[in-house]
């Protein structure tokens, strides 16, 4: 009977150890995936900020061109009178 108890405790102990190791590896994998997701998010954020900057510059250039065109049209209209 004592032999069975020792064997059972040994099996339970080894099972707990292996379970602990598996959980640790799982946590490490989740941490690695989280880091990869963070890196991808940072890359996307950087890309969107660049696109936003380019869009702002394009809008400024378009507004400036439209302003010049409007000023030219007004100048022509005033000059014709």
From Swiss-Prot:
GO molecular function, one term: guanyl-nucleotide exchange factor activity
Keyword set includes Secreted: yes
PTM comment, free text: Amidation permits an increased antimicrobial activity against some microorganisms such as T.album and S.cerevisiae.
Major subcellular location class: secreted
Entry-annotated residues carrying Valine amide: 78
Subcellular location field: Secreted; Target cell membrane
Residue ranges of the propeptide: 23-43, 80-81
Keywords noted in UniProt: Amidation, Amphibian defense peptide, Antibiotic, Antimicrobial, Cleavage on pair of basic residues, Fungicide, Immunity, Innate immunity, Membrane, Secreted, Signal, Target cell membrane, Target membrane
GO CC terms: extracellular region; membrane; other organism cell membrane
Ranges of biased composition (kind: Acidic residues): 30-40
Residue ranges, annotated region (Hinge region that separates the two alpha-helices that constitute the peptide): 54-55
Region Disordered, annotated ranges: 24-46
UniProt record similarity statement: Belongs to the frog skin active peptide (FSAP) family. Dermaseptin subfamily.
Known role: Cationic amphipathic alpha-helical antimicrobial peptide with potent activity against Gram-negative and Gram-positive bacteria, fungi and protozoa. Acts in a synergistic effect in combination with Plasticin-B1 at doses that are not active alone. Acts by disturbing membrane functions.
Name under which the protein is recorded: Dermaseptin-B2
Gene (name only): ADR
